[in-house]
């Protein structure tokens, strides 16, 4: 098990101790949330404001998250307490960089990690995940065997397959409640939900051909929707 004369992780029984290369690939994740809120008012008017910031560092290198949330709400009572107005605004912006692939083979660094021969030194491919190709005049992926569509150098995936996802969302709501008399009340409400998603991906040349062409690939996608 784990000798270097095979292309996958299974082989003859090893005679030398080996290190746990998987632990060297992962790191400790960290999530930090900072928030502040302010409220003020009297019997006629109330205001509320809050802001929250979330930052995250994933267990895989290059994975980052940044999120901002703003909430503002105001309620008021006018016309001798007969009309009540309530307005609410929520703003959110989130940026996620190099989000890991969930399951599957493509763009999943775990496939290469678990199939890597245990008798070889993974640190070499960490420090030399790309090598210069004189015929193409550029750096190309370096792996212990001819990389397949579903198995690539995990450090190539984290460094040379880059993505950025951005989401902006705005939620608005407004309600008005008018008391005509003791037995009749009229109410009107309105809502709007808008969001915009953007995706940017870069695949460097020599990434598996199932994902891109020989010279790499650039993906740009925009999506917007409004619901009322």
What feature does the model see in each segment?
Residues 8-9, 24-29, 35-42:
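Outer-membrane beta-barrel initiation region
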Residues 31, 42-43, 78-81, 179-181:
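Outer-membrane beta-barrel channels and translocator barrels
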Residues 19, 44-51:
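Transmembrane beta-strand segments of Gram-negative outer membrane beta-barrel proteins
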Residues 35-39, 50, 73-75, 173-175, ...:
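Outer-membrane beta-barrel architecture
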Residues 30-32, 227-228:
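Short Pro-Gly-centered flexible turn/kink motifs
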Residues 1-19, 59-63, 69-171, 187-228:
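Surface-exposed loop/interface segments of Gram-negative outer-membrane beta-barrel transport/assembly proteins
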Residues 51-57:
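Transmembrane beta-strand segments that form the barrel wall of outer-membrane beta-barrel proteins
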């Amino acid at each position: 098990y784990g000798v270097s004369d095979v292309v996958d992780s299974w082989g003859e029984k090893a005679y030398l101790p080996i290190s746990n290369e998987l632990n060297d690939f992962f790191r400790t994740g960290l999530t930090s949330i900072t928030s502040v809120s302010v409220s003020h008012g009297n019997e006629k008017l109330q205001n509320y404001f809050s802001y929250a910031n979330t930052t995250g560092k994933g267990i895989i290198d290059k994975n980052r998250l940044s999120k901002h949330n703003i909430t503002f709400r105001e309620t008021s009572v006018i016309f001798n307490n007969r009309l009540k107005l309530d307005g609410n605004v929520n703003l959110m912006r989130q940026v996620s960089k190099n989000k890991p692939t969930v399951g599957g083979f493509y763009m999943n660094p775990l496939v290469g990690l678990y199939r890597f021969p245990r008798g070889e030194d993974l640190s070499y491919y960490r420090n030399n995940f790309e090598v210069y190709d004189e015929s193409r005049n550029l750096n190309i992926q370096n792996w212990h065997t001819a990389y397949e569509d579903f198995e690539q150098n995990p450090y190539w995936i984290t460094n040379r397959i880059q993505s950025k996802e951005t989401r902006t969302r705005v939620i608005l709501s407004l309600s008005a409640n008018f008391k005509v008399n003791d037995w009749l009340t009229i109410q009107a409400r309105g809502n709007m939900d808008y969001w915009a998603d953007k995706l940017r991906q870069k695949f460097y040349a020599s990434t598996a051909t199932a994902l891109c062409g020989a010279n790499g690939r650039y993906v740009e996608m925009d999506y917007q929707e409004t619901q009322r």
